[in-house]
């Protein structure tokens, strides 16, 4: 099963559409958004997404109630707050935005999760800490690094790769 990972869209509508196109091309079954949508008007742009979507809030997400409402208008979509524990088969995934560095490090270090997904830094990276796969899909917006990225996560292989949106 392929899972799409995205973070830090920051209202960049064109890159949201590029990410959705890539997720649909790759037949992902689930998309995890690690926060910083920013404005609620971004959420309807995800409507062409064929997969289910689970999200968390980021530090720049202002109108959280309206973001929740926009998510609830789509079957199979949910926004869980600041943290989400997701089970895909026997794989446990922790997702948070990552702006609380102590919490992020504790989740990575404690070994309770197979995968930890976060955003916030806008820096795409994939590494292992013990048995835990840690993935930051980078910034979909491309504002800070100049690179617009997402990630694809293979649940069976417990492997991820970064995809640049072009």
Ranges and model annotations:
Residues 10-15, 38-41, 61-66, 100-105, ...:
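Active-site environment of divalent metal-dependent phosphoester hydrolases
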Residues 32-33, 96, 118:
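Redox-cofactor binding/interface segments in oxidoreductases and associated redox assembly factors
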Residues 2-10, 92-98, 133-138, 162:
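Active-site-proximal beta-strand elements of phosphoester/diester hydrolases
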Residues 30, 93, 114-115:
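Short, Asp-centered acidic motifs that coordinate Mg2+ and/or phosphate
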Residues 52-57, 117, 134-139:
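Short hydrophobic/aromatic-enriched beta-strand-loop microsegments
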Residues 27, 112, 120:
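Conserved functional loop/turn residues at catalytic and ligand-binding sites
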Residues 2-87:
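Core catalytic region of metal-dependent phosphoesterases/phosphodiesterases
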Residues 80-89, 105-112, 128-130, 135-166:
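Binuclear metal-dependent phosphoesterase catalytic core
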């Amino acid at each position: 099963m392929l899972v799409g990972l995205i973070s830090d869209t920051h209202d960049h509508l064109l890159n949201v559409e590029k990410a959705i196109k890539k997720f649909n091309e790759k037949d992902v079954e689930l998309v995890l958004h690690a926060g910083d949508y920013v404005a609620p008007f971004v959420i309807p742009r995800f409507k062409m997404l064929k997969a289910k979507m689970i999200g968390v809030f980021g530090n720049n997400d202002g109108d959280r109630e309206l973001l929740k409402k926009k998510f609830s208008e789509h079957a199979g979509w949910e926004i869980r707050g600041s943290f989400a524990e997701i089970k895909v088969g026997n794989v446990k995934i922790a997702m948070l935005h990552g702006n609380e560095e102590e919490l992020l490090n504790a989740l990575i270090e404690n070994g309770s999760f197979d995968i930890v997904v976060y955003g916030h830094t806008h820096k795409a990276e994939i590494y292992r800490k013990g048995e835990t796969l840690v993935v930051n899909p980078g910034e979909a917006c491309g504002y800070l690094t100049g690179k617009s990225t997402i990630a694809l996560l293979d649940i069976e292989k417990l492997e991820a790769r970064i995809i640049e949106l072009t």
